Every structure is written in structure tokens, then in C-alpha cells.
Amino acid sequence: MIIEQLTINHLEDFHHWISNKQAVAYSLSAFLPERDIEWSRQYLEQITSDQDSWNQVISVDDTNIGFCGLSGISEVNRCAEYFILIGETEHWNKGIGTDAGQFVLDYGFSILGLNRIWLTVSEPNIGAIKSYKKIGFREEGIMREACCRNGIFHSKIVMGLLRKEWLNRSKS
């Protein structure tokens, strides 16, 4: 697995990933309506120029399969939100998301000096929840019925990891 900076050169892959309805089922609401390539270009330009985010592409065997990183990076509060989307579903359940997550946590805590990294995950997304717990995230709360997919409301789980927890985990 290789993780490197996400750029506008990844536009076709990015558009392909967010067009995969299975991959974005529990992702950002912005990805749910079918989007054209121009929308994807504008979105990608926006996130890759955002100084408060760190956006990476995940590659396996010379194939780009998704993206991950940190958004809303706050130097004052020393926290950020973790995100990941593996758009090539044939790479699900192979530990790639877990490995990518560990890489992002290492970067956030070691390089950026963050104190807290957090995320939200849709309650039905069991595979993601297992992966997040495996890399050390803990459940902090529930945002009740915060998401609506296919006319059904479900809750989002707020998870977080503190630097001291990550350091203790790294020692064991």
C-alpha cells in the first residue's frame, strides 16, 4: 500500500469512487446525488487547496483505490477529523482501510502534534466501526437519527482517539 498526496491529477479516479453508490452509501451526503465530472473537479480543487486538511490517495499494486486524511485541522485546539473512502469495493475487508487509518493517525499525532482525532460513522457501517476500533478509536457519543439514506433515518456514532491513548497503544 502506498499513500501519497491527493491532487487534481486523481480526478478521474476520484470521480469514479464517488460515483460508486455502494462505496458512498454511508459517506458524505454531498456524494449521494449523481455528480458530473465538473462537480468532482471543483470539489477536488476545493479540498486539495484547503490549508486545514491533509488529503491522501491510497494505492495498492499501482492502482488508486480511495482516499483518506484529516480535515478541519485546528492548530489552536490540536484536533482534526479523520476520513476515508475506499472506492474500489473489491479492496474492502482486506485490512487496507485499517492500515491507511494507522498511517493517518501516525501522521496526525507524530508529525502534526495533534491531541485528538475524531470521526463520525453511520451506525449500519459495521465494517468501518470494527476498523476504527481496531486502530484505537473509542465511541464517544451518538448523534441520533442524523442521517437519512433511502428514506430511513439512522444514527451516527462519534468516535475519538486522544494522543495519550495512541501513545499507550503504540507502547503495547
Question: Language-model features: where?
Answer:
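Acetyl-CoA-dependent GNAT
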Residues: R35-E90, L162-W166
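Terminal substrate-recognition subdomain of acyl/acetyltransferases
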Residues: I152-S172
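Conserved GNAT acetyl-CoA-binding A-motif
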Residues: S110-T120
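A short, well-structured alpha-helix characteristic of acyl/acetyltransferase catalytic modules
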Residues: M1-R41, E165-S172
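Glycine-rich acetyl-CoA-binding "A-motif" of GNAT/NAT acetyltransferases
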Residues: T63-G66, G127, F153
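Conserved catalytic-core motifs of GNAT/GCN5-like acyltransferases
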Residues: W118-V121, R138-H154
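Conserved acetyl-CoA-binding loop-helix of GNAT-fold acetyltransferases
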Residues: N93-Y107, I129-K134
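Conserved active-site tyrosine of GNAT-family acetyltransferases
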Residues: Y132, F137, M159
